[in-house]
């Protein structure tokens, strides 16, 4: 079975690798399910990391910051501006997928235990 895959902007790859970033917000990119996910640098497909998806929530973009406890870091305007880098048409009322995953290190442990 093909592993599910998403691309990531290059500047976010180090934060995923270090385990600092454990979620991603996606809009209209198809359904991601629990299990292994390959995150690929969108400018260099040899640069990829595998993480284990633990949760997928569908919610409005306007609800994401509160769900992640980041209301102060991500006021609506900041979140919307960041998301429009990737999705120019997105709105605060758009339904997005909030994908939560293990760190690459935790994922490796999980995959080697099975």
Q: Which sequence ranges carry the predicted segments?
A:
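Structured alpha/beta reader/binder surfaces that contact nucleic acids or chromatin modification marks
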Residues: 2-114
């Amino acid at each position: 079975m093909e592993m599910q895959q998403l691309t990531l902007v290059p500047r976010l790859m180090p934060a995923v690798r270090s385990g600092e970033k454990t979620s991603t917000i996606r809009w209209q990119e198809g359904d991601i399910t629990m299990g292994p996910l390959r995150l690929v640098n969108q400018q260099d497909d040899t640069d990829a990391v595998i993480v284990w998806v633990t949760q997928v929530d569908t919610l409005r973009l306007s609800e994401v910051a509160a769900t992640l406890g980041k209301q102060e870091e991500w006021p609506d305007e900041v979140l919307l501006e960041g998301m429009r880098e990737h999705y120019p048409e997105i709105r605060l009322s758009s339904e997005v997928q909030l994908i939560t995953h293990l760190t690459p290190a935790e994922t490796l442990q999980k995959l080697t235990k099975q």
